[in-house]
Structure formats: C-alpha cells, structure tokens
Amino acid sequence: MAENMTTTQIEVGPGATNATINFEAGILECYERLSWQRALDYPGQDRLNRLKRKLESRIKTHNKSEPESKRMSLEERKAIGVKMMKVLLFMNPSAGIEGFEPYCMKNFSNSNCPNYNWTDYPPTPGKCLDDIEEEPENVDDPTEIVLRDMNNKDARQKIKEEVNTQKEGKFRLTIKRDIRNVLSLRVLVNGKFLKHPNGYKTLSTLHRLNVYDQSGRLVAKLVATDDLTVEDEEDGHRILNSLFERFNEGHSKPIRAAETAVGVLSQFGQEHRLSPEEGDN
C-alpha cells in the first residue's frame, strides 16, 4: 500500500442532527422559562414563538426518518437539551443566582409557571452528547466470515447465506479479501438484524464499518453516530457488496482510501460528509 495514503474518517448518520435539535429544544426551554419569569421582551417573545414553530416542524420531519423506538417529542428533546447545556456549561442546577429570586418561586400558583424543576428531567439516553466510539464495540458471539480468492458472485452469495443464518441483534462481520493476491483488507461491520415471524432475518441498521490493510492500519472508517437504517435486506447487502466492487475493480495501483470512502458513502447519498484528504495523491 502506498505510504502516502491517509486514513479517511467519515461520520455518517443523524447524530449531529439529533444533537442540534435537542440543543435548540433546550434553548427553547430557557426562552420559555425566561418568559415565565416575565423577563422576556416583545422581540424575545417573537423569537420564542418562531423557534418553537421551527422546532416542531423539524422534529416532525426528522422523526419520519427515525425508527419508531428513537422518535422523540419536543418535550423529551427539551429535557435532553437542558442536560446538554448542563454538561457544556458545568452548571449546577441547584445553585442559585445572587440577587435574583425567580418569579415562579414567588408565584407558584400562577398558571403559566411549570410544575416541575430541573431535577424532574429523565436521564439522558445513552452517553452524553452522542459520544463516538473509536473502535467497533465488543459484542457477544460476533459473526466472522473469511473470504479468500473468491469472485464477487461467490463472495456475495456467501455473505447472504451466512448473515441470514445468524441470530437477531448486534453483530460484527470480519472479512478478509485478497486483491490480486497482493493486498488483503480487513472490513469490520457492526450492525443489527431484525427477525421476522417467518424466520427470515434482515439487516436493519449498520452501526459502523472499518477497513484495515494487511498491517492493521485503518484505511477507511465509517462511523454511524446514531446508526444507519437500511430500507430492506437487499439494500443492506447492496451496501456491503459495494465494498467488494470497490476493492475488486482490478486497479493497477493501490486503492485509495478516498475512493473507497466515496463508494461507500454514495450508497447513502452522503458523499458530502467525506473529510478532506491530505497527501493522498
């Protein structure tokens, strides 16, 4: 492999979108609390109303692209957004502000005041601020398939046969593939299967994908912060098979990490997320 090849890191998935929506929902909560304290002027009230309308619309649209288990209401996102702010600002929610007595503490019976406090918020799901793991997570009984000296058709068939006989849940798929008997690449795929009533299993999410060269160096990395949902089983295999197409096109020179990344990202329409390559000539 060429020495000037650089590691290409790609981040794909709605993680940043979720974080942004949740943070803006936290801002909306702060606006509303300021309004309850009768401390928001007319322009501020107008911004509050516009932000609320924008968030309601954006959440409705975003939830359509999320699996049902991950869809959240505006109120749920407010709770997470407030916790994000507390993490970002190291804010102590029990600390008071000298010289300031909140209006709602003096007039708690007012109908505009909320009947909850900071400590009523549910815990933030998962890790704070969508932490991104650097390596595929360890999973019990990982799936491992080794492919050597197979043509694309046989390799694809073996993948399809093997992955559809595995148990439902998270898996890790390890593939070794020779390219012209010169270069072997190791591909780690972390994803999830769904089990249907008829016993058929389909690939529903792709958590992450790493590609290593024969020396163990990472040459391409796809991180799904909130997982990549694939529409159906055929779509899932199409994504995996595209890797073999990228790795087996008969290039006369070593395959570039950037080319591989573009090939994978194009399956999701996410080419714009490719990080700039430096020194990969």
Curated annotation (Swiss-Prot):
GO terms for biological process, alphabetical: symbiont-mediated suppression of host ISG15-protein conjugation; symbiont-mediated suppression of host PKR/eIFalpha signaling; symbiont-mediated suppression of host type I interferon-mediated signaling pathway
RNA-binding and homodimerization: region residues: 1-93
GO MF, any single term: protein serine/threonine kinase inhibitor activity
GO cellular component, one term: host cell nucleus
Purpose of the protein: Binds and inhibits the conjugation of the ubiquitin-like G1P2/ISG15 protein to its target proteins. Since G1P2/ISG15 is an early antiviral protein, NS1 may inhibit the host antiviral response. Prevents EIF2AK2/PKR activation, either by binding double strand RNA or by interacting directly with EIF2AK2/PKR. Also binds poly(A) and U6 snRNA.
Subcellular location: Host cytoplasm; Host nucleus
Motif (Nuclear localization signal): 50-55
Name under which the protein is recorded: Non-structural protein 1
